[in-house]
Amino acid sequence: QIEEMKSHADDINFEVAKEREKVERHDVMSHVYAYGVQCPKAKGIIHLGATSCYVGDNTDIIIMAEALKLVRTKLVNVIAELAKFAEEQKNQPTLAFTHFQPAQPTTVGKRATLWMQEFEMDLEDLEYVLGSLKLLGSKGTTGTQASFLELFDGDQETIDKIDPMIAEKMGFKACYPVSGQTYSRKVDTRVLNVLAGIAASAHKFSNDIRLLQHLKEIEEPFEKTQIGSSAMAYKRNPMRSEHIASLANYVMSDMMNPMLVASTQWFERTLDDSANKRL
């Protein structure tokens, strides 16, 4: 049975699953069915004792961890570039502003360290959240592992090995010690808060660049063939900074989504998160 399952681990029969979902209206069970068609000998043990959240929630945590690692790499690169710029411009005098009114002298490099420091704060938050991410593991329908107690005839010693084995297999240090049917949706709020924090720092940076471009102190790259406006081709709009601000607004506004989901989970779980969590 196990060898049969291994032989079909990567050739997912999406067409069979798609047609089955029209009947069952359940994404995970449709794939369980499709896997069973490919592995008739193992059909009776596929997904045995598990839940849909064992599949979906553990996958989501893995995806979030990989995504945060990607964001971390890009964030470190941004900090490095800002540090380089700050060093190069540390003696370049400029006028500081408070309330966007002329204040006292500073340097271009000093101002850049303000941007850099906020991204460094975001990096600290990201490292903490990434380091604290754990898998759901396999806790059963309500977090008690009752199905495994039955499958293993009450052998608690064997059951206690399940979550550590899952964590090790998936490259994590541990699984959350307790859960309902799902991992706590507070986890999602942590991740989105980090992303929203990065977005806020990026937005502040883009604001300053746009204001400085208006003052003719710093200007975005402008290509030879670039057109500033369909009606005013001579314009040199700060479109890169505007793109940053626009995307940052979306990320920051999305921060409320997981907060609302976490606050409306009833007891061991509800399905309020089914659609918007995927978005």
Regions found by a protein language model. Give the residues of each.
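Generic structural signal for well-ordered, non-membrane alpha-helices
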Residues: 77-80, 84-87, 121, 200, ...
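Short acidic (Asp/Glu) and glycine-rich catalytic loops that position anionic groups and cofactors
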Residues: 9-14, 222-228, 263-271
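Long, amphipathic alpha-helical stalk/connector segments used for oligomerization, subunit docking
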Residues: 250-279
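Glycine- and acidic
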Residues: 17, 65, 185-192, 271-272
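A helix-coil-helix interface module used to build multimeric assemblies
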Residues: 1-146, 152-167, 228-229, 239-243
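Acidic, glycine-rich loop-and-beta core segments that form the ion-binding/anion-interacting portion
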Residues: 157-255
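Short alpha-helical linear motifs
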Residues: 26-28, 215, 266-270
